[in-house]
Amino acid sequence: MKLVKCGKIVVASLCMMATLAGAAMPALAISPAGCTSLAQIEEMNDDEEAQVQALKAAIAKVNVKYDEVAQSWEFDSPIYDKAEKNKTCCLSPWIYIFDGRSEVYFDEDFSYNGNSEIPLDTLYIRAGDYLYTYECDPDYTDYAYDTDKKVWWALSNFEMEPSEIDWLRNVLGEKKIITRYYGAGAQYDYTWTADDRQAVTDMVNLYDLLVTASPEVRARALRG
């Protein structure tokens, strides 16, 4: 996985069936189990030690790599390796930060493994009344046939803006989440498992904790 600032083309559409029927808009989704709420994070802001311990607990759930040359940290979900091993699909977020800087970068990798060739150009996430559409940038999308595993694979990367991470919070509050991989008239629908949901929850939780922590607090959690 390359540590780069990736380009993206993302379109969000929020389908509200209740609204079309004249009903009120549904409330925003509740935080899933195991996810630290934003209110809880705000309460910890005055207690640096609590922030450090919360960060350590969140970091322990993901993969961590440090680049001494770039002085950067990369965090990614174990779900990607699991999906590759099982020849299945996943949405795998990854995060990177730089020593001494406040910015937190959040990317999403959509990975497909299956029997059909799908040169990805569009991805959809359906969860309840929410429908989010991702238009793949050819520069950050690829596909091929793996002769060793005997499966077709495809991958598309998106760099997400802070407001767009709310899309994940929204879908995590729904009972069923489906990702549709589409391209050149071919498509495949993948229903998220409990492991998929937990993996994304863990990464969103880590992102929220990193955003609210100072570079000094992050350093204590990562190097302490």
Question: Could you say what each language-model-derived stretch is?
Answer:
Residues A18-S31:
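C-terminal segment of classical bacterial N-terminal signal peptides
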Residues K2-L14:
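Bacterial N-terminal signal peptides that target proteins for export
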Residues L28-G224:
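A generic "folded-domain core" signal
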